[in-house]
């Protein structure tokens, strides 16, 4: 396996955490997870995540079992019904974020690249993602960004991957293939050439076999 320079440079940090934790974070980063760089603390990484109101138990699960071991974390409701301008409104989203930590700084260097045109960092698929991916990653990826898809008699799972390029989606398909999961690309946006990954219906049982023991209660989607 060839390693890129960035991955080699952060291997000591990566190797300092259990594989199960790394695999979980990978699944989250393929889904709704985000890492930003603090403007106050010398560009150190902060992990954050926003999900709908129905996913609060899942966010607490991630916080309690994964992210709180690195730093203190804080939850926010949106809209903030304690504010006068939001009085009477229903909460639609929950957001949590960590404080800065060297692990998140290191992972940011893998998961993001600077885009001059957009003048910001954009999320990418890391070159060595195969070293950080397992069935645990798949389970959390599905819980983050999986969708039960039923068209006629065809029942399967869609993974929301339109934030990644077609080439990156193909890389992600190769990860699924290593788990003996077949998939196809489903066009989402022809103009911008964006795709979702559709798990082949013949592989649905394989997916369930791999992830059901990992998915938390109330988030087994099929």
Predicted regions and their residues:
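Internal intein/HINT superfamily modules and their associated LAGLIDADG
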Residues: 1-222
């Amino acid at each position: 396996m060839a390693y890129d320079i960035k991955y080699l440079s952060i291997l000591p940090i990566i190797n300092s955490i259990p594989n199960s934790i790394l695999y979980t974070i990978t699944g989250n980063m393929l889904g709704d997870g985000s890492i930003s760089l603090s403007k106050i603390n010398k560009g150190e990484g902060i992990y954050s995540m926003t999900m709908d109101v129905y996913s609060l138990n899942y966010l607490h699960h991630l916080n309690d079992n994964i992210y709180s071991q690195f730093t203190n974390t804080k939850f926010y409701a949106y809209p903030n019904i304690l504010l006068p301008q939001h009085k009477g409104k229903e909460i639609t989203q929950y957001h949590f974020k960590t404080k800065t930590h060297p692990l998140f700084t290191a992972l940011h260097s893998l998961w993001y690249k600077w885009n001059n045109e957009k003048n910001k960092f954009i999320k990418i698929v890391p070159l060595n993602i195969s070293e950080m991916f397992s069935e645990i990653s798949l389970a959390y990826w599905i819980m983050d960004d999986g969708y039960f898809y039923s068209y006629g008699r065809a029942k399967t799972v869609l993974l929301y991957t339109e934030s990644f390029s077609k080439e990156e989606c193909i890389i992600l398909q190769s990860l699924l293939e290593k788990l003996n999961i077949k998939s196809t690309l489903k066009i989402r946006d022809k103009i911008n050439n964006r795709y979702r990954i559709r798990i082949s219906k013949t592989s649905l049982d394989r997916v369930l076999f791999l992830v059901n023991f990992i998915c938390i209660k109330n988030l087994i989607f099929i």
